Amino acid sequence: MSRGAILFAFNNPKYDYYAMAEYTAKRINHFLDLPVTLVTDESSLPLKTRYKFDKIVKVEPDTKNKRDGVAWINKGRYQAYDLSPYDETLLLDADYMVNSDKVLKTFDITEDFCCHDTTHFLMHPDASQEFLSTYSYNTLWATVVAFRKTKRAKQIFDCLKMVQNNYNYYGDLHNFIGGVYRNDYALTLALRIVNGHTLLPGDIIPWNLIHVGKNTQVYANTKKPFNTEYTVMFDHWNRGKIRKEYITIKDCDFHVMNKDIFVELING
């Protein structure tokens, strides 16, 4: 039975997502010992690169999604089921920092499909969990997904496509802001629709998704190519003054929400 990872990466005028995906793929190879397939478009591919993905799948991106005034090409994640060449697949965001082999445990959790339903923000331990809206579901996260090529997993990805195609309708129904498409919101709805508007224990990764959020900086503690130790710094405002707070983390996977920070980590 084959096992691998799949990443989606489409460049826009602000960020080189291909470079992010290449960096993440190298860490997947190193820490997880898995091959990596990249889904991208022709214009995102560099003219020269020394890294070789297991497979590159070129698709036509949907560029209608806009964020911060530029195209945010994050639609089409539902294609992961059909485009993955593996029997068991890890679907990761290109800005997910792999620092251990912990994510491999997701394949022991479920027979079909699993994702995170809770988060922890570094330096923000009291941050509340996210909901679609005040009276709707708690958000599921598409940052880390594990799935197998099963009938039920296929149904989930087919439903994800349906939600994407009717995103504004579901925004009105669940009272969240439509327009800017979010994979997290689409997954939140698709998985519950397939399950009869509930969640199954095997669908949930039983540890928090670690986020690096706003007003937080991350610095690699060494120049090693596969460094796993970082200093996390937070500017804490107290009575009109800034107090810098620090922690050190090691061998901890985390998702970098601020792409500028991820680029800085790539560039050393």
Task: Annotate each language-model stretch with its function.
Residues 12-21:
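A short, glycine/small-residue-rich beta-strand->loop->alpha-helix junction that serves as a flexible
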Residues 58, 73-124:
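GT-A fold catalytic core of metal-dependent nucleotide-sugar glycosyltransferases
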Residues 80, 144-146:
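Conserved hydrophobic/aromatic beta-strand scaffold that supports enzyme active sites
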Residues 1-7, 17-18, 38, 51, ...:
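A glycosyltransferase accessory/donor-loop signature
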Residues 27-34:
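Short, acidic, metal-binding catalytic loop of nucleotide-sugar glycosyltransferases
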